[in-house]
């Protein structure tokens, strides 16, 4: 293993908090990253991007949704892109349930409807409240159902051993309203 001999904890490449265990190594020093145009990084604890963005799958869609967004029976079950946020984050940012939101990273913006739910709970980390934004990654610009792609927001970072993409966690900002750029 490239980052052996012993496993240790590293915060994601973009994290809202500093690594409490290893201040001298905030991130995995062996991680693969691509310092290329269009792939800027937020840095650790960047106040411009204070929220954790996590991407995930939905039961009704397969892989990135490229195959299932074209099936009418599946499109009916999950007809649009959405983001999940807590009632606390919705109140803090003036977001209405079902209203449009814009999720922003240094790499781009995405728009979706807000699903305000207790499933996405604020966390206490490093002595402060850290809010989470959940964004299913099955949507895109083609198919019977369309929507902003969560993958447009993620950075190009991978683990050092098998190059698994670190697209499941990053930092973002979220605001009420629909961006014209997304």
Locations of regions flagged by a protein language model:
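Interdomain regulatory linker/hinge segments that flank or connect interaction modules
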Residues: 1-43
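Long, contiguous, secondary-structure-rich segments that constitute the structural scaffold
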Residues: 2-6, 11, 15, 19-20, ...
